[in-house]
Structures are given as structure tokens and as C-alpha cells.
Amino acid sequence: MYSQTKIAIPIFQAKKEDVIKVAEDCIEKGADVLEFRIDALDNPNFDDIKEIIEEINFPIIATNRISSEGGSFKGSEEERIDILLKCAPLVDYVDIELQSDDRYIKQIHDTGVTTIVSYHDFHKTPEINEIMYIVEKEQKLGDIAKVAFMPNDLDDTLKILAILSHCENTIAISMSDLGSYTRVMASKFDSPITFAAGRDVTAPGQIDIETMKSLLNMDLNLME
């Protein structure tokens, strides 16, 4: 048996040459996908972004994270979306936040790229019915739903497992050390993607890729 869950490593670097260097390191460590955090670049312009994507030549999630959800992009919303639209033909996935205008999400989805519609809350975990509402809305707008919440107790992390067990094509994460196990459990529910750390931790509770691969392989061996 094998897991169909891909391991993605976010690349959060300010300089073009560092993005490429870290990407090569993460590929060598066994990443299945790289999340290119475009918003981390010092001066993101499409010529540099295109060069990076072509140089890496590996499955990529293009993310240009909005500041209200932990991102660093400093331009206008129109500039942020324009970069994602230009990236769409060059990458495997585009991540766009649910709070973005629906017309922008539709424009990206209409390019044909696999569209991840995401929602992050770094302060709390809502009630299960609210999470379900968010996921269902994301699924209507895109191809893959993504939610990530900060747990305040163990019960909050169990809500994430419930979402994973009931919702297809969904990435669901409970952040912090308390919720880190949900990143491993994602493979149990055939979540399309889980996130691990390469050189740097870019979100609370990320597990380094070596440990993640070891845990996933251990789990799969027990199931054989």
C-alpha cells in the first residue's frame, strides 16, 4: 500500500538565487511538490518569477499570500492576482485565498490550473459546522479546498480529522505543536497534499520532511 498524499515544502526566500538553491535542496530531500511563496521575494516581478519556475522545473504551487493570512506581498490586490494569473500556465497548482474576490478566483480557475482555495486563521479553530461551510464554499470555487486553524485544545485538532474524514479533495491542518499530528494523519484520509518543512519552518507545527517521510513510511509498513 502507498499514500497518495503528496508532501509539499514551502520555499520562503527573499532572493531569486536562494529560492533556486533551497528548492534544489528540498527536491533532494524528497519533496513531491514545492510551494513557491512569491510574496517572500524582495521585489517580485514576473520575469524573475518565470525564470525561477523554469529553473526549478518541478511540480509547483504558486502562492502569493495576502498579508491578512500571514503573507508578505506589499503591492496592490490587482498586482497580486496578476502575478498568479501569469504563473498559472507555468505551474501545477495556484493557491488563492477564499477571502479574495470571487471574480479573481474564477479567473484563475478558468485558466485550467488546479486551483487551491485556502483559508487560514492563526488565532482559533471555529466550530465544525463553520469549517464545513468554509470547505464547501472553497470546493465550489476551486479544485482543492484548504483550511488551516490554530487549536486551543485537543478537541480543536479532532475537528480537523473530522473534516478530513468527510471531505474529499481537502487539505485540512491544525497548526502548532498540538496539531502537528494532523499533518501526518492527512495521508490516512487521502488528502491530496500535506506540508512539511525543508530548511525553514514557515508555519506553526510543521514537521521536517525527513521526519514526515519516516512517519508516513512507518505507518504504511504497519498497514501492509
UniProtKB/Swiss-Prot annotation:
<keyword id="KW-0057">Aromatic amino acid biosynthesis</keyword>
<feature type="binding site">
    <location>
        <position position="202"/>
    </location>
    <ligand>
        <name>3-dehydroquinate</name>
    </ligand>
</feature>
<dbReference type="InterPro" id="IPR001381">
    <property type="entry name" value="DHquinase_I"/>
</dbReference>
<feature type="binding site">
    <location>
        <position position="183"/>
    </location>
    <ligand>
        <name>3-dehydroquinate</name>
    </ligand>
</feature>
<keyword id="KW-0704">Schiff base</keyword>
<comment type="pathway">
    <text>Metabolic intermediate biosynthesis; chorismate biosynthesis; chorismate from D-erythrose 4-phosphate and phosphoenolpyruvate: step 3/7.</text>
</comment>
<feature type="active site" description="Schiff-base intermediate with substrate">
    <location>
        <position position="146"/>
    </location>
</feature>
<dbReference type="GO" id="GO:0008652">
    <property type="term" value="P:amino acid biosynthetic process"/>
</dbReference>
<feature type="binding site">
    <location>
        <begin position="35"/>
        <end position="37"/>
    </location>
    <ligand>
        <name>3-dehydroquinate</name>
    </ligand>
</feature>
<comment type="function">
    <text>Involved in the third step of the chorismate pathway, which leads to the biosynthesis of aromatic amino acids. Catalyzes the cis-dehydration of 3-dehydroquinate (DHQ) and introduces the first double bond of the aromatic ring to yield 3-dehydroshikimate.</text>
</comment>
<dbReference type="GO" id="GO:0046279">
    <property type="term" value="P:3,4-dihydroxybenzoate biosynthetic process"/>
</dbReference>
<dbReference type="Pfam" id="PF01487">
    <property type="entry name" value="DHquinase_I"/>
</dbReference>
<dbReference type="InterPro" id="IPR050146">
    <property type="entry name" value="Type-I_3-dehydroquinase"/>
</dbReference>
<protein>
    <recommendedName>
        <fullName>3-dehydroquinate dehydratase</fullName>
        <ecNumber>4.2.1.10</ecNumber>
    </recommendedName>
</protein>
<keyword id="KW-0028">Amino-acid biosynthesis</keyword>
<keyword id="KW-0456">Lyase</keyword>
<dbReference type="GO" id="GO:0009423">
    <property type="term" value="P:chorismate biosynthetic process"/>
</dbReference>
<comment type="subunit">
    <text>Homodimer.</text>
</comment>
<dbReference type="GO" id="GO:0003855">
    <property type="term" value="F:3-dehydroquinate dehydratase activity"/>
</dbReference>
<comment type="similarity">
    <text>Belongs to the type-I 3-dehydroquinase family.</text>
</comment>
<feature type="binding site">
    <location>
        <position position="206"/>
    </location>
    <ligand>
        <name>3-dehydroquinate</name>
    </ligand>
</feature>
<feature type="active site" description="Proton donor/acceptor">
    <location>
        <position position="120"/>
    </location>
</feature>
<dbReference type="InterPro" id="IPR013785">
    <property type="entry name" value="Aldolase_TIM"/>
</dbReference>
<feature type="binding site">
    <location>
        <position position="65"/>
    </location>
    <ligand>
        <name>3-dehydroquinate</name>
    </ligand>
</feature>
<dbReference type="GO" id="GO:0009073">
    <property type="term" value="P:aromatic amino acid family biosynthetic process"/>
</dbReference>
